[in-house]
């Protein structure tokens, strides 16, 4: 008997523990929400499931909205008073009158005031029936916080959405008339306008400033990338010049080093000449065999699309110039660059021959003289007629060549 009574008593105690409500949560403690859940209710959900129940003193499903008198704090102090939220915060707050017998609410805060913006937005019940009259559940008002005293306050980015009820049945949240003043004293009048309103507080992000900051960051990154890449480019260029030796012709070398000018002109990489058995001695021999003067006028021709000189007769070939130290033999690809000691005096004529080679314009008058050297061989005398360009297949123009160093 004793064992059966003890077992039945323990079972009753366990049943009572199961039906007992959980202990009340301490104020300010964070609610126990499953991972991934966010508290972002709609306007209708805020009014129906939270504000109405709070006004009717019905227990809420979860303590997620704190009770704070918003007008006793500045908006930047409210996030630490909230129970839950990262970008927006929810509060139950009372509302007082501005004047004892008036209906206007008091919007003054610690260091500023809340100013209403726009018109009140009605919150209607959701309905799907055709022609169904939707019930008005509450009113939503938007307010902006200003620092200082009205009307010269400084506008901030802090926004408040205030929700209040419109149905007076079973609720004390709606605006109620002030109690009558007795004894001629206004101090006894109550300033309470609404017991509870629900407020959502957040700070608006200035999109224009955010966009300017992003563009400024991108511009700084681009400048840093350019500054970082330029030394690498310059170092790579110098390394390339050192690897090619004197045969590597960069624009700076062509402008500042006359001794390497002709070598850079004959470099296969810069001139783009096809492989062949051309040698500098053939060019010099062709120049010595020509009775033409050093400076010649070259007339433009319509038979060739390569008009390398200006159409006016002012285009004059540069004067011959000797290049000291050009007494070396070097092979560039299949093209031989050879010179001996007796070619030192003929270097100027070789330059003139190369000038004629680089400007294959046919002669239109008998007074003009022109020599075309194609792969080391001069053209036949009949090449000075209209078909002079038939043997020239790939004229090459060297960009960036300074003929008057």
From Swiss-Prot:
Q: What is this protein called?
A: NAC transcription factor NAM-A1
Where in or outside the cell it occurs: the entry states:
Nucleus
Give me the Gene Ontology terms describing cellular component: nucleus
- Gene deletion effect: No visible phenotype, but higher chlorophyll content and delayed senescence.
Q: Where is the NAC domain?
A: 33-204
Tissues expressed in: Expressed in flag leaves, green spikes and peduncles.
Is DNA-binding among the key words of this record? yes
One Gene Ontology BP term is: system development
Q: Where are the transmembrane segments?
A: none
Q: Name one Pfam family in it.
A: NAM
Composition skew (Low complexity), residue ranges? 1-10
Q: Which InterPro entries match?
A: NAC-dom, NAC_dom_sf
Q: Which Gene3D superfamilies match?
A: NAC domain
Q: Where is this region: Disordered?
A: 1-38
* Misc. remarks from the entry: High grain protein content (GPC) is a desirable trait in breadmaking and pasta wheat varieties because of its positive effects on quality and nutritional value while Low GPC is a desirable trait for barley malt and beer production.
Q: Which SUPFAM superfamilies match?
A: NAC domain
Record-level Gene Ontology MF annotations = DNA binding
* Annotation: DNA-binding region: 137-210
Q: What is known of its domains?
A: The NAC domain includes a DNA-binding domain and a dimerization domain.
